[in-house]
């Protein structure tokens, strides 16, 4: 047993800019703030907020859809329900599937959307890449959805080892 204190989970406060939008639900505001925090480099949050404004306007003008709804549906289509953990037992390493916490699933979804947007080559700027990736993910296409499907296939392929994670957790390790 570890003698260290449990880490207190810090909540990231949503931007005041998006809280004032009455059309956005609290879940959409939470996803927007997660996206902003994941994209922020060197504390330059205002730059990323302007970039998110461009993303939402681009989706609104090009696809005639609400940007926050596209963000929410994209994250719901990309978020995983299972993840694969490496577990070393008796000199062998097993890939063991385990369920994903909902907050972690949204974090993984946003991370996968950003990574697959960064790998896109057709658009010039990052905000265009993210806007296109969000729209494709909301329609069930794109690199982030493929990453989720690959993750689920890996979990299904290693379903035989799922009993190991429950034994491991019940022992307290």
From Swiss-Prot:
GO biological process: translation
Gene3D superfamilies the UniProt entry points to: Ribosomal protein S7 domain
GO cellular component terms attached to this protein's record: small ribosomal subunit
Signal peptide: none
GO molecular function: rRNA binding; structural constituent of ribosome; tRNA binding
Function per UniProt: One of the primary rRNA binding proteins, it binds directly to 16S rRNA where it nucleates assembly of the head domain of the 30S subunit. Is located at the subunit interface close to the decoding center, probably blocks exit of the E-site tRNA.
Similarity remark: Belongs to the universal ribosomal protein uS7 family.
Name this protein carries in UniProt: Small ribosomal subunit protein uS7
């Amino acid at each position: 047993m570890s003698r260290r204190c449990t880490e207190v989970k810090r909540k990231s406060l949503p931007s005041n800019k998006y809280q004032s939008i009455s059309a956005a639900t609290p879940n959409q505001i939470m996803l927007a703030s997660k996206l902003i925090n994941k994209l922020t480099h060197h504390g330059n949050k205002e730059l990323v907020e302007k970039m998110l404004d461009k993303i939402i306007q681009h989706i609104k003008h090009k696809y005639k859809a609400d940007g926050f709804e596209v963000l929410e549906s994209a994250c719901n289509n990309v978020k995983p329900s299972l993840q694969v953990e490496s577990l070393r037992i008796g000199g062998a390493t097993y890939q063991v599937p385990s369920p994903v916490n909902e907050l972690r699933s949204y974090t993984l979804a946003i991370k996968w959307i950003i990574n697959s947007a960064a790998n896109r080559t057709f658009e010039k700027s990052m905000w265009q890449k993210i806007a296109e990736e969000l729209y494709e993910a909301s329609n069930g296409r794109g690199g982030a959805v493929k990453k989720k499907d690959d993750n689920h296939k890996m979990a299904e392929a290693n379903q035989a080892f799922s009993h190991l994670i429950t034994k491991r957790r019940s022992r307290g390790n």
